[in-house]
């Protein structure tokens, strides 16, 4: 059996690790409940996720209070049954999550300065619960979708059985689990940065079912507003499967260690431009190794030039050291919870590429610019900052006008007096702003 630790490298300096420690950086990478935290700054990452967990708890408590208040104002028997079930779901979900995320209560002392200096942090748009529905799909009701994804990946392997597989952005890990169970590879490494997905899946694949509540987006029946799910794997995962908490943009592995790298629903949602991310994937593969990308290939990038079409993606991959590139397209069900009226079909593409040559590597990923990190360079007056400054001033002024007495028309007149906007435009703008504020105060969240 291949020694898992022999594959690892420091995400700070890329030097090999010794017993999950980097001698050069003088950093020990902790293991919490059997999962190594291989972020560039593990203590800061743990603190960051702990803080996000506390924020999520506060939001959950707020929603619970909102439901309790609604119960007190309603007398319809059917409505009360639905609201009481929703309230129970929130209460029980908090208990389930607290048990599951116990490792986040063991975080070390925060080291913000080191965190900043390394310019690493989890993406701000990714919360603990961003992909919680994937747990229910992977380990409860999504067998059709799971099997299609697994079948597409297995077909793309074209009969080879890699000794070392890496799944980047493994999420709730059903695909990584299915590959490991069926291909009899010596070792499978699943990397993700979300501790909720990682700790839930770690329990599940090791034969310890996890209880969580699902709150379908569009419940079909009143009793579907909050559903207790038992998430379990068909069988305990066989030896050789390793879960890692880390950042794929600073993947903690030595170069050329893997025979296959799988990127499911990953390459088009990661924050880095594909011209940088594809070479990083190349680096992880040995010569002749296979890269398989699976997903919708719908790039979400600020720069329009990075929202690649399939032909552009294939061309770029060729320039990044890959050859024999094949693409297969299909329409598949996506997140079709049987208890929700919400679901869709997704056009996915499975891309197979073989590493032919090494690719020139971009600079180490930095999430933060120097003018934020060291504080000694001028903050650039970008167009975005100028626009945001104006918007913020107007929003702050509007909020200052809310005193419980002024009408929307009164406020629009005052904006005109301040020569910020014409009254007709101000009326429309304030109405839109207040609509957003009103809707956000009652918005629900996924748990």
Task: State what each model feature region is.
Residues 288-297:
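Conserved beta-strand signature within the Rossmann-like core of class I S-adenosyl-L-methionine
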Residues 246-261:
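A short acidic, Gly/Pro-enriched loop at the edge of an enzyme's catalytic core
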Residues 30-157:
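Conserved Class I S-adenosyl-L-methionine-dependent methyltransferase catalytic core
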Residues 275-288:
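A short glycine-rich, Lys/Arg-flanked "PGG" loop and its adjoining helix->strand segment in the class I
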Residues 320, 334-376:
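Core SAM-dependent methyltransferase catalytic element
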Residues 205-250:
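S-adenosyl-L-methionine
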Residues 172-185:
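Conserved SAM-binding loop of SAM-dependent methyltransferases across substrates and taxa
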Residues 384-447:
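Long, charge-rich, low-complexity alpha-helical segments
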């Amino acid at each position: 059996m291949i020694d898992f630790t022999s594959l690892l490298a420091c995400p700070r300096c890329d030097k090999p690790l010794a017993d999950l420690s980097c001698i050069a950086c003088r950093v020990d990478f902790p293991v919490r409940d059997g999962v190594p935290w291989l972020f560039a700054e593990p203590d800061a990452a743990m603190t960051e996720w702990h803080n996000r967990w506390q924020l999520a708890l506060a939001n959950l408590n707020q929603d619970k209070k909102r439901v309790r208040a609604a119960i007190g104002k309603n007398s319809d028997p059917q409505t009360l049954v639905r609201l009481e079930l929703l309230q129970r779901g929130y209460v029980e979900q908090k208990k389930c999550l607290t048990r599951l995320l116990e490792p986040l209560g063991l975080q070390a002392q925060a080291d913000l300065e080191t965190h900043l200096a390394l310019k690493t942090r989890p993406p701000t748009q990714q919360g603990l619960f961003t992909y919680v529905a994937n747990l229910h799909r992977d380990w409860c009701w999504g067998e059709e979708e799971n099997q299609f994804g697994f079948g597409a990946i297995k077909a793309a392997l074209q009969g080879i059985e890699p000794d070392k597989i890496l799944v980047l952005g493994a999420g709730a890990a059903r695909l990584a689990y299915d590959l490991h169970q069926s291909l009899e590879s010596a070792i499978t490494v699943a990397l993700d940065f979300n501790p909720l997905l990682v700790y839930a899946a770690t329990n599940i694949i090791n034969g310890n079912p996890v209880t969580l509540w699902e709150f379908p987006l569009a419940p079909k029946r009143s009793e579907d507003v909050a559903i207790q799910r038992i998430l379990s794997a068909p069988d305990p995962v066989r030896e050789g499967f390793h879960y890692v908490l880390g950042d794929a943009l600073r993947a903690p592995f030595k170069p050329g260690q893997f025979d296959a790298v799988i990127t499911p629903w990953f390459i088009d949602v990661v924050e880095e431009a594909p011209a940088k991310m594809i070479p990083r994937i190349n680096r992880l593969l040995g010569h002749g190794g296979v890269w398989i990308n699976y997903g919708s290939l719908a790039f979400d990038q600020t720069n329009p030039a990075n929202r690649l079409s399939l032909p552009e993606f294939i061309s770029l991959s060729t320039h990044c050291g890959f050859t024999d590139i094949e693409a297969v397209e299909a329409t598949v069900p996506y997140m079709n919870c049987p208890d929700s009226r919400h679901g869709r079909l997704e056009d996915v593409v499975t891309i197979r590429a073989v590493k032919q040559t090494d690719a020139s590597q971009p600079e180490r990923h930095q999430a933060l610019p120097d003018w934020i990190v060291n504080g000694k360079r001028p903050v650039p007056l970008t167009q975005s900052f100028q626009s945001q400054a104006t918007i913020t001033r107007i929003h702050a002024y509007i909020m200052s006008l809310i005193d419980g007495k002024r009408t929307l028309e009164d406020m629009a007149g005052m904006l005109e007096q301040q020569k910020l906007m014409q009254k007709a435009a101000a009326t429309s703008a304030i109405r839109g702003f207040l609509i957003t504020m009103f809707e956000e105060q009652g918005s629900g969240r996924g748990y």
